[in-house]
C-alpha cells in the first residue's frame, strides 16, 4: 500500500494510508498482479527455463521501453509484455510480434482503480504484416507512462 515510513518491527504498519487514493491504488495493483500471476500459465509454467522467455526488444534506450514474450506450455497461453519505464506516454508505439492475429489487452497497470490515468487502454488490436524487431508482424499500441501492459492472442 505504499508505506511511506521505514519499516519498524516495534510499530504497526501505517494501514491508515489506505484512506488515500494513491496508496489504495498501490494495494489494488499488487492484488491484481498476484491474481494475474496465478491465472496466467505463461508466468509460472516455464519460469525457470530459458524457453519460457523471449525478448522482443531490449534496445530501445531512447524511449526506455522493453518488450518480451513469456511462454507457457501451450502457445495459446503466451503473453506479450511491454513496459514503459518513463513518465512519458508512448502513443502509437510499434511492437514486433511472432505471428498474425488479434491481440487482446489482459493487464494494464494504468487502470483508474490502480490510481492510473485510465486513458491508455488498448482494445482488440490487429497485427499487420509489417516487419519490426526482426519479426514478420507488428502492431501499434499506446503505452501509458511508468506502466506495464500485457497482451494475449485472441483465439
What are these language model-derived features?
Residues 1-155:
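Carbohydrate-interacting/catalytic domains
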Amino acid at each position: 500500500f505504499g508505506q511511506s515510513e521505514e519499516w519498524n518491527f516495534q510499530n504497526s504498519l501505517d494501514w491508515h494510508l489506505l484512506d488515500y487514493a494513491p496508496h489504495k491504488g498501490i494495494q489494488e495493483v499488487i492484488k491484481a498482479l498476484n491474481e494475474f500471476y496465478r491465472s496466467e500459465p505463461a508466468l509460472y509454467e516455464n519460469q525457470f527455463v530459458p524457453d519460457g522467455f523471449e525478448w522482443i526488444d531490449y534496445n530501445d534506450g531512447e524511449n526506455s521501453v522493453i518488450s518480451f514474450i513469456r511462454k507457457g506450455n501451450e502457445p495459446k497461453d503466451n503473453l506479450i509484455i511491454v513496459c514503459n519505464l518513463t513518465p512519458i506516454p508512448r502513443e502509437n508505439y510499434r511492437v514486433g510480434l511472432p505471428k498474425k492475429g488479434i491481440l487482446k489487452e489482459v493487464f494494464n497497470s494504468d487502470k483508474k482503480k490502480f490510481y492510473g490515468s485510465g486513458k491508455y487502454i488498448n482494445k482488440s488490436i490487429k497485427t499487420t504484416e509489417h516487419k519490426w524487431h526482426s519479426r514478420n508482424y507488428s502492431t501499434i499500441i499506446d503505452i501509458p507512462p511508468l506502466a506495464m501492459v500485457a497482451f494475449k492472442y485472441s483465439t
